[in-house]
């Protein structure tokens, strides 16, 4: 597991360095029979980075997509690293803004596997619309050492007609020879000068031949000068 964490950390540093160099960057590297594929897409006012690395027969696929456009900004990052295992990482950030509104979406997905299967999916949407303001952040991490690890994080937000909306979603799944799944769903709305904030955190850790599941759902909506906030946290550990 130490090798797995070290490999993931080194790839994350590489991703941070690459992110400052351009809007859409895809990097893939493989050795000793490994297969790696990286795809990055950025449309307007957006940054997208995808990095995949595989070795010793491992398979790594990283897909990053960011849209942004007009008064919206989207930042998407995906990393997949596999050593004799399979790592699939998918990250999507949307944003938009539309007609005077502003939106920021940030999405990060990391999947790393040693002889196992790691699947990570992250999506952050946000909107804005007219004079609304929306901010959305989603992070997903799946780490597997001869087991199955699945992490799924989705953060939405809206804002709409002058409101402020904020969403934060964080999901982590870690296993050592077992099965670990973590899913976090966060929604926020607001409208007409209202404010809404929602935060969700899900963590799942499992040991040898054990199964651990974590499910988190946080939802907050406000209408006409209202204010709402919701927070949800679920941490499950089976060592």
Regions found by a protein language model. Give the residues of each.
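Gram-negative bacterial Sec-dependent N-terminal signal peptides
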Residues: 1-21
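Low-complexity repeat regions of mature extracellularly deployed or surface/particle-associated proteins
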Residues: 21-239
């Amino acid at each position: 597991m130490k090798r797995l964490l070290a490999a993931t950390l080194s790839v994350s540093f590489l991703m941070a360095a690459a992110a400052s160099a351009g809007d859409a960057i895809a990097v893939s590297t493989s050795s000793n029979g490994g297969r790696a594929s990286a795809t990055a897409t950025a449309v307007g006012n957006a940054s997208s980075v995808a990095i995949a690395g595989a070795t010793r027969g491992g398979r790594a696929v990283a897909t990053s997509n960011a849209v942004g456009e007009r008064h919206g900004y989207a930042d998407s990052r995906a990393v997949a690293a596999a050593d004799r295992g399979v790592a699939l990482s998918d990250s999507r950030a949307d944003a938009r803004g539309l007609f005077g509104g502003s939106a920021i979406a940030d999405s990060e997905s990391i999947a790393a596997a040693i002889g196992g299967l790691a699947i990570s999916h992250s999506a952050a949407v946000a909107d804005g619309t007219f004079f609304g303001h929306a901010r959305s952040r989603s992070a997903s991490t799946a780490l597997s050492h001869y087991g199955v690890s699945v992490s799924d994080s989705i953060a939405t937000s809206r804002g709409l007609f002058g409101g402020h909306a904020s969403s934060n979603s964080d999901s982590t799944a870690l296993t050592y020879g077992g099965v670990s799944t973590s899913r976090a769903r966060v929604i926020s709305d607001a409208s007409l000068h209202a404010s809404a904030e929602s935060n969700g955190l899900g963590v799942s850790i499992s040991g040898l031949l054990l199964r651990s599941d974590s499910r988190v759902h946080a939802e907050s909506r406000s209408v006409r000068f209202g204010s709402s906030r919701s927070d949800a946290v679920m941490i499950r550990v089976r060592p």
